[in-house]
Amino acid sequence: MLNNAMSVVILAAGKGTRMYSDLPKVLHTLAGKAMVQHVIDAANELGAAHVHLVYGHGGDLLKQALKDDNLNWVLQAEQLGTGHAMQQAAPFFADDEDILMLYGDVPLISVETLQHLRDAKPQGGIGLLTVKLDDPTGYGRITRENGKVTGIVEHKDATDEQRQIQEINTGILIANGADMKRWLAKLTNNNAQGEYYITDIIALAYQEGREIVAVHPQRLSEVEGVNNRLQLSRLERVYQSEQAEKLLLAGVMLRDPARFDLRGTLTHGRDVEIDTNVIIEGNVTLGHRVKIGTGCVIKNSVIGDDCEISPYTVVEDANLAAACTIGPFARLRPGAELLEGAHVGNFVEMKKARLGKGSKAGHLTYLGDAEIGDNVNIGAGTITCNYDGANKFKTIIGDDVFVGSDTQLVAPVTVGKGATIAAGTTVTRNVGENALAISRVPQTQKEGWRRPVKKK
């Protein structure tokens, strides 16, 4: 159906005392992203004209963490209830738009459920998201007459009979802006908590003869809030289980779905295999037939077809062409680039460095600010000395170069095509094409040498 323009209000003023943290509750992360950011993203995906964020505790931290240009910051200086929070945002409501109310500590609400709620909202009435619980203790109960919603009674204000009701309020609702402002102005704090409840607008709407339509989410986890770290950890596992299931159904082989974390977006080809305890962060692309070993962390990187990443390797902001092999225990830092068939072995670190086609750095090596050609062998213990304490400098190594073990290349320096660097050499000047560079101290030998003996 055709929807009205819509703005979203996100309540995020709570302190989160039970988190036992200096960080505002809504900034605690789920799947690598602040809880409230999940809600903001859902609002934006839904096409919100404006997102009003009602904040209180930790406002400076919130503003530092959330840089969404679409946010309108609304201060709730005193936390006097959900109705009071909405009253602070009400001056920003347009009369002819719908207002959707969400919560910064309910991170798994889906766009599909919110669109269903939006579509179900009757003209001039309220769309309400509700669920039925076997044990509704502590939640506001939905009251009905002849099947029609008449109001919401908070648990502390409910009678014994009302407490038997299993349908509860999730707190998520949508109504017209003009109606919302009128109802908010009529709220009182005449209740056990002495607070202004947004839920009281349901009874006000019913008294005006307005229709209230209740819809249910696809999954209960969508409307579960977070008040402590235990609840947050449970929602994290729910989320990760859902992501793992989607990947498995899409053809990705997860060796143990319970030991896989997706903290971003994963784009993948066919026949991808991911072993246990792998973490994917940010935006990651895996080509066809990629294999990732146990304990790896891949962040904001592109991995080409037929690449194999061995266990306990960290890849961040890197690009790998096809058929590269990495690890185990390798680290590719931002700006690392491997061309087709390149190999980076155990205990090799790269940063802002390119390794050419078929080139190899087998072990115990640091390559920083370096451009390395094709078919180059980098021996064990090689270091590009790129930093003088103030500035970074570049090392350039041409095609078909052989770099012996325990070599130091003091940048800026260039090694020409086909050159050979003898083991143990410290390169401080450019090396010509097809030349041999050697800087070792001449070996001496003392015949009949005896090691010192400790005196007894």
Curated annotation (Swiss-Prot):
Acetyl-CoA binds at residues 380, 386-387, 405, 423, 440. InterPro entries: Bifunctional_GlmU, GlmU-like, GlmU_C_LbH, Hexapep, Hexapep_transf_CS, MobA-like_NTP_Trfase, Nucleotide-diphossugar_trans, Trimer_LpxA-like_sf. Keywords: Acyltransferase, Cell shape, Cell wall biogenesis/degradation, Cytoplasm, Magnesium, Metal-binding, Multifunctional enzyme, Nucleotidyltransferase, Peptidoglycan synthesis, Repeat, Transferase. GO terms for molecular function: glucosamine-1-phosphate N-acetyltransferase activity; magnesium ion binding; UDP-N-acetylglucosamine diphosphorylase activity. Residues 230-250 are annotated as: Linker. The keyword Transferase applies. It is found in: Cytoplasm. Pathway: Nucleotide-sugar biosynthesis; UDP-N-acetyl-alpha-D-glucosamine biosynthesis; N-acetyl-alpha-D-glucosamine 1-phosphate from alpha-D-glucosamine 6-phosphate (route II): step 2/2; Nucleotide-sugar biosynthesis; UDP-N-acetyl-alpha-D-glucosamine biosynthesis; UDP-N-acetyl-alpha-D-glucosamine from N-acetyl-alpha-D-glucosamine 1-phosphate: step 1/1; Bacterial outer membrane biogenesis; LPS lipid A biosynthesis. SUPFAM superfamilies: Nucleotide-diphospho-sugar transferases, Trimeric LpxA-like enzymes. UDP-N-acetyl-alpha-D-glucosamine binds at residues 11-14, 25, 76, 81-82, 103-105, 140, 154, 169, 227, 333, 351, 366, 377. GO terms for cellular component: cytoplasm; membrane. Disulfide bonds: none annotated. The active site is at residue 363. Residues 1-229 are annotated as: Pyrophosphorylase. GO terms for biological process: cell morphogenesis; cell wall organization; lipid A biosynthetic process; peptidoglycan biosynthetic process; regulation of cell shape; UDP-N-acetylglucosamine biosynthetic process. Mg(2+) binds at residues 105, 227. Its cofactor is Mg(2+). Its main location: cytoplasm. It catalyses: alpha-D-glucosamine 1-phosphate + acetyl-CoA = N-acetyl-alpha-D-glucosamine 1-phosphate + CoA + H(+); N-acetyl-alpha-D-glucosamine 1-phosphate + UTP + H(+) = UDP-N-acetyl-alpha-D-glucosamine + diphosphate. Homotrimer. This is Bifunctional protein GlmU. The lineage of its organism: Bacteria, Pseudomonadati, Pseudomonadota, Gammaproteobacteria, Enterobacterales.
